[in-house]
């Protein structure tokens, strides 16, 4: 029987976010949870079991960005046994089918649910918790953000102990956890007004693995971890914006119970610029021009990220006018298109004039009339009409 599409199994489309995928999994998994079929017929139990396995298989693939990418490209063939470059098929053994119910019910499971015990399978449910994610703020210049740059960062993290290879045991020797008898979880009961409520939580001694060291590692004292400094080259793509993150899977902190490392998130912080203000892919700047250039028009030099550029200022330019310089902004992070530079013109009033300059300016002013001042002329006409209406 051909496998159903994983997106169809969870009732979502390919554009679904990580949060949407998790919500869809919760809904589907709870619908076919074993506790809901405790009194059902054998046929109904078998059908629910198959659907439940199918739901968890779909979630394991779609919740992992790398596996999701492989599935989107190759479909189910990406995970078939012997598939080239993908290392075998789906393995439910290492997947925590109950973790989603712990999210909902505070770690207590759903009615004592452990693995596939509701379907007659093994009751052992080990819980492998990943290491913590790390965040690193990387400060770069606007020019580096525009053109892309390679940076080397150093950060401290909790890594795996080299002596015990992360097991916490001297010579890697482990034994069954006596607290949980190798189950990885402990169960407690509490009397409430609704009756006896049963909950399940991760074993505090083995952290869900079901194993503890026969003898604690002398280097890490049984934690399986050690502090270390990591050096990493970070390739910052051209067009990246302030606050955007670069994710490096597995470069976060090590797990204390043999689980996968957390992830490293490099958060980009762009330094403020002396000339430009960025808005998306556009750059804004103010360029002061002389009074005569504003009146007569001309060319002015402006800065760009690629060097100097001359732009034309039209005759009679007002202060505050915006001039667009196409294609001199930031390249799109998606790889197509480029923003513009938006130049805001400001007219600088000359100061510290000599008597001769003042005299020449006065004569020039006297030579002008209403036709030379369209806005002033229009305003004065409105003022005259305003007072005329009051008097009438």
UniProtKB/Swiss-Prot annotation:
It holds the Pfam family DnaJ. The J domain is necessary and sufficient to stimulate DnaK ATPase activity. Zinc center 1 plays an important role in the autonomous, DnaK-independent chaperone activity of DnaJ. Zinc center 2 is essential for interaction with DnaK and for DnaJ activity. This is Chaperone protein DnaJ. Homodimer. It comes from Fusobacterium nucleatum subsp. nucleatum (strain ATCC 25586 / DSM 15643 / BCRC 10681 / CIP 101130 / JCM 8532 / KCTC 2640 / LMG 13131 / VPI 4355). HAMAP family: DnaJ (MF_01152). GO terms for biological process: chaperone cofactor-dependent protein refolding; DNA replication; protein refolding; response to heat. SUPFAM superfamilies: Chaperone J-domain, DnaJ/Hsp40 cysteine-rich domain, HSP40/DnaJ peptide-binding domain. The lineage of its organism: Bacteria, Fusobacteriati, Fusobacteriota, Fusobacteriia, Fusobacteriales. GO terms for cellular component: cytoplasm. A zinc finger (CR-type) spans 148-229.
